[in-house]
UniProtKB/Swiss-Prot annotation:
Main subcellular localisation: secreted
Record's comment on post-translational modification: Mostly non-hydroxylated.
Reported function: Probable toxin that inhibits ion channels.
Comment on protein domains: The cysteine framework is VI/VII (C-C-CC-C-C). The presence of a 'disulfide through disulfide knot' structurally defines this protein as a knottin.
GO cellular component: extracellular region
Keyword Secreted: yes
The name this protein goes by in its record: Conotoxin Am6.7
Record-level Gene Ontology MF annotations: ion channel regulator activity; toxin activity
Length: 58
């Protein structure tokens, strides 16, 4: 997992994925990446204390 400041999330996620994460509407792509995480495209992300924790889905 890579921790990134909330303001930097668009570097890692496409805009519509970012919006879906904020609205908790991401749909899982492929296998789930991690429990309680949302998967968009080939990324998996969840928020803790205003930080995004991001990794590639595999």
């Amino acid at each position: 997992w890579r921790k990134t400041p909330e303001g930097a999330d668009r570097t890692f996620l496409q805009q519509e994925c970012y919006q879906e994460i904020r609205q908790k509407r991401c749909r899982t792509v492929g296998r789930p990446c991690h429990y309680s995480a949302q998967c968009c495209s080939d990324f998996c992300a969840h928020t803790i204390s205003n930080y995004y924790y991001i990794k590639r889905c595999s």
